[in-house]
């Protein structure tokens, strides 16, 4: 045996030819090994000229993590619908009135809530201290309306939550505040009116997310190497998959027969098994069902207010507790026996709030969409007598449920105005409250501020010239 001078690896000395060949092979091998080590060292430092590679993560992600990252985007990106700066003032907390204090806030609207930040959300999150969270407003069951009478500023609307919190939002730029109003209103309309339904949906949402995570984890574990007993159970499942498929087909067939044979909605309604709710029903449908031209609930509310609310300060202007109003709404929709003299409806502002909500929830307002432009043209006339005659002519053309309900409502409001010295509610104040509620354009995207002026003026004229219009 002989050792090479350039290597510690022994080389056999059989014959010169073989020895020479072995030395050549050894040199080639050593050179290749040295080249491989050099390449490997370079690959650990540089991938391209002048470009440093990122450190290799030692964490091994499983299959479910890859799926969650690639398929499911961050929840915040899915939920945020709109964000930007607005002027904000909180005027009530849990039903307790607060002093109005306007501040500039960065507002983030998601599908179920609004968050108020003092700065943009990105800056707020980066600067946020532990426990310092933005103010959050749950939109489920909330109510949004224009609140011209609540502030001297222009373009102000109010959000009232189920918990009794009230916020004013404002911007001097018309199209910005209009865009925000419709975005928030659409978000509220998409949510269930019943708070218990909202909580059930929330729980279902959590269950679905947790189930999807478990499913991904289960899928990931199945991709790993299986033990023999697992293979046997897999074969057992495959063996019975054919029978499972036939069972599913039988279930589908039975469901299809059940769906095709079930009675129509009209049949169920005719038999009285399904009834439309009071709130949110078309006025003519509700009156036809009750065999009257004025809804029973409207007459009950007016009777209660005239019995114990004519002299109450700010009647119809002051908001009642929204949670109690929603409770009253639920009872009315269930067509349970309603007694507004009950102690739980002691606050008359709850009754007036429910009455205003009834008119707001009408699919078509008390002044029908088809008459909106005609009423606006009538109020534009210069001569007061001409305006009154034009309005009177239009009122007489309205469908009986609209005309009769209008007559009863405005007749009631004239009694409120007659006690203005005590309740401080003038014709102008009631016009501001009821104008946008009873009269609105089908498409509110244009000239909202101009329409609001006409809405108030029409409501005021209906009150001031009530005897002439409804004579």
Swiss-Prot record:
The modification Phosphoserine is found at residues 43, 196, 199, 243. GTPase activator for the Rho-type GTPases by converting them to an inactive GDP-bound state. Has activity toward RAC1. Overexpression results in an increase in actin stress fibers and cell contraction. This is Rho GTPase-activating protein 15. GO terms for biological process: small GTPase-mediated signal transduction. Keywords: Cytoplasm, GTPase activation, Membrane, Phosphoprotein. Residues 281-470 form the Rho-GAP domain. It is found in: Cytoplasm; Membrane. The lineage of its organism: Eukaryota, Metazoa, Chordata, Craniata, Vertebrata. It is a peripheral membrane protein. The PH domain is required for localization to the membrane. GO terms for molecular function: GTPase activator activity. The record marks 317 as: Arginine finger. Coiled coil: none annotated. The keyword Transferase does not apply.
């Amino acid at each position: 045996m002989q050792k090479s001078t350039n290597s510690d690896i022994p080389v056999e000395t059989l014959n010169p030819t073989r020895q020479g060949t072995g030395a050549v092979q050894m040199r080639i091998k050593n050179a290749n090994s040295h080249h491989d080590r050099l390449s490997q060292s370079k690959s650990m430092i540089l991938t391209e000229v002048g470009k440093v590679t990122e450190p290799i993560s030692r964490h091994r992600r499983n299959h479910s993590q890859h799926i969650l990252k690639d398929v499911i985007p961050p929840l915040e990106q899915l939920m945020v619908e709109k964000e930007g700066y607005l002027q904000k003032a909180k005027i009530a907390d849990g039903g307790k009135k607060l002093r109005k204090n306007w501040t500039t806030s960065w507002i983030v609207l998601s599908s179920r809530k609004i968050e108020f930040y003092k700065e943009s959300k990105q800056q707020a999150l980066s600067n946020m201290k532990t426990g310092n969270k933005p103010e959050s407003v749950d939109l489920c069951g909330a109510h949004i309306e224009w609140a011209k009478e609540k502030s001297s500023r222009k373009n102000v609307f109010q959000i009232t939550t189920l918990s009794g919190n009230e916020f004013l939002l404002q911007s001097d730029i018309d199209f910005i505040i209009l865009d925000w109003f419709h975005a928030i209103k659409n978000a509220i309309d998409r949510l269930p009116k019943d708070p218990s339904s909202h909580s059930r949906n929330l729980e279902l949402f959590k269950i679905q997310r947790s189930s999807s995570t478990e499913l991904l984890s289960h899928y990931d574990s199945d991709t790993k190497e299986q033990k023999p007993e697992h293979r046997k159970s897999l074969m057992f499942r495959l063996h019975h998959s054919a029978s499972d498929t036939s069972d599913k087909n039988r279930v589908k067939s039975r469901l299809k027969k059940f769906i095709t044979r079930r009675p129509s909605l009209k049949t169920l309604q005719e038999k009285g098994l399904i009834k439309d709710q009071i709130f949110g029903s078309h006025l003519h449908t509700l009156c036809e069902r009750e065999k009257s031209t004025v809804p029973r609930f409207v007459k009950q509310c007016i009777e209660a207010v005239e019995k114990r609310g004519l002299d109450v300060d700010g009647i119809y202007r002051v908001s009642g507790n929204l949670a109690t109003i929603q409770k009253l709404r639920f009872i009315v929709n269930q067509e349970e026996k309603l007694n507004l003299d009950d102690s739980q409806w002691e606050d008359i502002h709850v009754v007036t709030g429910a009455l205003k909500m009834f008119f707001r929830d009408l699919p078509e307002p008390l002044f029908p969409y088809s008459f909106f432009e005609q009423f606006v043209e009538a109020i534009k006339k210069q001569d007061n007598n001409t305006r009154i005659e034009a309005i009177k002519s239009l009122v007489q053309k309205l469908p009986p449920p609209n005309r009769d309900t209008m007559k009863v409502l405005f007749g009631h409001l004239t009694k409120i105005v007659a006690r203005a010295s005590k309740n401080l509610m003038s014709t102008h104040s009631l016009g501001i409250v009821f104008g946008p509620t009873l009269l609105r354009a089908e498409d509110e995207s244009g000239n909202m501020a101009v329409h609001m002026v006409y809405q108030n003026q029409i409501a005021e004229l209906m009150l001031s010239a009530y005897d002439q219009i409804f004579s």
